[in-house]
Amino acid sequence: MNCLIIDDEPLARIGMERLIRQYSHLKVLGTFRNAIGVADFLKDNEVDLLFLDIEMPGVNGLELARTLPEHTLVIFTTAYSQYALES
């Protein structure tokens, strides 16, 4: 399963990538610090699963998720409990 990590916090990206790489059926294709460039990456690469931070500068994770192809799975990551219901 091809994955992307999108999070504005460097330590969160590093931690998620280390965790995901422990599972042989998951392959991290890339990491992004914000939503910029993700749409273009998705046009050129087959991505099955996004680990997506909600609170990021510019386009937030919820806005980005609304633009994704329906078949793309999303696991939202956030430090803010107020986003739990909306995500």
Feature roles, as predicted:
Residues 1-3:
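Extreme N-terminal starter segment of soluble prokaryotic enzymes
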Residues 6-7, 32, 50, 77:
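Conserved sequence signature across two-component system core domains
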Residues 12, 21, 57:
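The feature encodes the CheY-like receiver
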Residues 12-14, 84:
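Charged phosphotransfer/docking patches of two-component systems
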Residues 18-23, 41:
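Alpha-helical interaction/dimerization surfaces of two-component signaling modules
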Residues 23-29:
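A generic structural motif
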Residues 29-38:
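Conserved Asp/Asn-Gly motif in the active-site loop of CheY-like receiver
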Residues 40-41, 45-87:
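CheY-like receiver
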